[in-house]
Amino acid sequence: MIRCNALIRFWDEYLQSPSVPDASLNGLQVQGPQEVNKVVFGVSASLALFEKARQAGADLICVHHGLLWGQPERLTGLLGERVRFLMNHQLGLAAYHLPLDKHPHTGHNACLMRALHGQNVRPFGTYHGVDIGFAGEIEPAALAEVVSTLEAFCHTSARVLAFGPKTIRTVGVVSGGAYSMLPQAISEHLDAYITGSLDEPAQEWCREGNINGISLGHYHSEKCGVEALARLTAEKCGIATEFIDIENPL
């Protein structure tokens, strides 16, 4: 068991959350029990996740995509129903968005870079003045081999825009819906850019920029950091944790 405020303080300090500007209201978003015995982790807040967390006996839910995004909102509609469920079932909710994207050990992008055995890894992917991804070198490998490694790691099927070098030596990684950072990868002459979702402009950017684009899906590109945080929390805080997968093809 751990006090809820002590657990939030641990996450805040480990992820350096207060120092990261973000639209997400990172930290505790909905108050639950003061004492936490079990935390359920998931990628995104939803009623489906909340119900599974209740069934799993959780006291607190921790997600990457929370409910509150820095703007005054009425507790009506979908938001109202989600908050009502949490309150009725005495479930707390915490969220960590950009702090989990950018963390050099536990973040999604660090995990993806490790899956490729990245070397000389450096911050990359500037978003509102904050580098939230990583770029680095990998052992030279065919594009198909890189894609296969990522698909196995993320348990997904990738979408590939093969317009760059056939042998990959340098990569940039920014998980989630980060197709707009593709021009940054082009300007740094990287061989491949890895993200969650690539939107319509990405095809011609890749063609004209001589770069390979690899899309893993927004959801699947951001499971690994949440899973890593769950493992770390169990190890450091001595409480039960469980990652719940609400499958999402997008």
Model-derived regions: residue spans:
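Active-site catalytic microenvironments in core metabolic enzymes, especially phosphate/sugar-handling
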Residues: 1-250
